[in-house]
Amino acid sequence: MRHDDVFRLNEPRRVAVLAVHTSPLAQPGTGDAGGMNVYVLQTALHLARRGIEVEIFTRATASADPPVQRVVPGVVVRNVVAGPFEGLDKYDLPTQLCAFAAGVLRAEASHEPGYYDIVHSHYWLSGQVGWLARDRWAVPLVHTAHTLAAVKNAALAQGDSPEPPLRTVGEQQVVDEADRLIVNTDDEARQLISIHHADPARIDVVHPGVDLDVFRPGDRRAARAALGLPLDEDIVAFVGRIQPLKAPDIVLRAAAKLPGVRIVVAGGPSGTGLASPDGLALLADELGISARVTFLPPQSRPNLATLFQAANLVAVPSYSESFGLVALEAQACGTPVAAAAVGGLPVAVRDGVTGTLVAGHDVDHWADALAGLLRAPAPAAAAMSRAAAAHAATFSWDHTTDALLASYRRAIREYTTERRGVGA
């Protein structure tokens, strides 16, 4: 299909995906890698299965990173050299956007004109580069923010650092320039409209998905045996980056009020959590619960599924969460979730049906929520487990890809109409 045919049929054949600050191939739970990485990789894989080629541009973070990594047929990751490989904080990345953009434009220049049909940027840093690429290549820009500075700053954990003003300015520019804006939930759409005055007609709600081939119910005792966890203890799992935003300390403080409960923490320090990488272990010691806290490094997807199967429940106490893939993945394994009633978590978790939503971060309230799930009668616990798995099964990456493609088609159609109007 030629480039002109793409705009005639509103059907993309090749997508340039921008993920400046973190590679989709990075292990979630380390550094800046999390749900966004999973989202970018899974949507790319599913687009490729439908015959749409995807090239993902990300910043190289090691000298050993090859310029091009072929993930599967139809999915390529391009590691763009922009700034030093190591020691560059995410907050310093705006200084390297020019270098990154130059690398993206050079890659496109090596192809025939009209190589990419659409640009999809993830996070505001990528949106800045996408804005330039959109104008240079004369193709539409679709943008997914994933998080917003104003939302994060309104719900900071104690002692956490606020997002800088330059990010708010940068996000506003991207919202103004993008042809379409993709959000995870209706709540996120309302935030874009109220904070950044986004045009509601340009917003598409696209729920993230879950890999139902990996995350599925399994035998709890077998899962615990595989991970070397006690067979006869109640287990509460926390999975994610160790940083104030994710509030792992709330899980420890709440569990300290529940004798006999084991806490499993899987993840690595990130963001402001890097300032005190041993902080959570020190807190466990201060609370006198070190003997019943198990720390695990970030886990592969199959191992993560095993951990979810092993746990009685999973806690997601984040101060801000645009969706909460961890909550969805846990439920896909039949494991109830106790989650903060923030952001997209009320969509990911059905309160009282697949888990519990907790208002605020009062430790006593969290202890009561965890205890309520752990002490539920066996029939009620089994019913909640079944409901959790059934709820998660409605969120597949195939459904996500359907909605994503619909947004791409709208972007191409509207861009084509606007371009013809300008030329008329």
UniProtKB/Swiss-Prot annotation:
It comes from Mycobacterium avium (strain 104). It catalyses: 1D-myo-inositol 3-phosphate + UDP-N-acetyl-alpha-D-glucosamine = 1D-myo-inositol 2-acetamido-2-deoxy-alpha-D-glucopyranoside 3-phosphate + UDP + H(+). Disulfide bonds: none annotated. Signal peptide: none annotated. Catalyzes the transfer of a N-acetyl-glucosamine moiety to 1D-myo-inositol 3-phosphate to produce 1D-myo-inositol 2-acetamido-2-deoxy-glucopyranoside 3-phosphate in the mycothiol biosynthesis pathway. This is D-inositol 3-phosphate glycosyltransferase. GO terms for molecular function: acetylglucosaminyltransferase activity; D-inositol-3-phosphate glycosyltransferase activity; magnesium ion binding. Pfam families: Glyco_trans_4_4, Glycos_transf_1. It comes from the Bacteria. The gene is mshA. Its EC number is 2.4.1.250.
